[in-house]
Amino acid sequence: MDEKKKIGILTFHNAHNYGAVLQAYALKTKLNRMGYKAKILNYQNPYIARLYRKGIHVDFWKRDILPSRWGKVFHEVGENLYGLREWKNQWTAFEKFIGEKLLDGQEKKLTLNDLAKERCDVYILGSDQIWARELTHGFDPAYFGQFAPGCKKISYAASVPNGSIPEAEQAYFEQALKSLAHISVREEKLARVVEKLTGKEVTTVVDPTLLLERADYEDLLYEEPLVKEKYIFAYFVVEDELLGKCAEKAAAVLGYRLIELHYKKTPKLKSENMIFDAGPREFLTYIRDAEMIFTNSFHGTVFSILFQKKFYSVYKENGRISNLLAFLNLEERHITAEDAMNYADGIDYTHVGDKLCNYRRQSVEYLKKGIEQ
């Protein structure tokens, strides 16, 4: 019997963001179920790692603490202290999930030089905006596969902001991506640009979270609901007044409790119905048991669909959500005003599931081709 191929995944697995950790979990899980031996490599971009280290920190190294900046600095520290208990709980929940579900107990952080020593049969770069220099404080060679010459590397659903590459950065991409055996990205727009730069075929694929079905996430959920009564769930990836108003109106009309999930507690956010310390498991459990969901998040939308919920995505501009809704013929779930809601409207998830299944199949075929050929 042939030994399983060893796959090393490089992504933003250590970011304390529901989408970031769940996409990493999904890609690793899918590859293992496809018969490979997948492992998330514990390489952490220094800048991103610093953002999520434990403890309150102020960017002294930026020289942001000139006397003219003291007011802003103390305001930021004050807001952090205000939500310190919740932030610590959230930090602990994310670190537990990352350690147990993503890294399988790995503790050593890998350097660029360490990556070659992992001796993987294939290295997969992605998903997420791993090619965004503004996120990694300059291009990070690890996410472009610039290590272990001669080892096979492919990308999966890699991305950049707005799906476009500034002209000044195109020469770097042209050179850096030449070493990849196969390339896939998140956006069609980006695919065309990368094809032109590299001369390679570039495939668009689903977000890794969509590679799995609802049942594949069951092991992450709490058995019992976190809220006993019926509730509307509102998830804010960024604060938005309209999103809050839509969720409040729906809860009032339907007579349900409103539960809001926010990333950070501030003095402006005060309600017993607001949650600030949820980890990935809590996030998914809140979605599973909600009667209806309101969100301005791509992954909030994704999991609303996977868990076959009534939902509304509330935003002004978000190409990523809009593209997903258009592909699944769910454009009516995007609203920009309170009076656009129809509480009786259901969703034909049979049709949605069929389209999703086909798209998922194409992405799995890309992975098989990328690994085996």
Enumerate the predicted regions with their spans.
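Active-site anion-handling motifs in enzyme catalytic cores
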Residues: M1-Q373
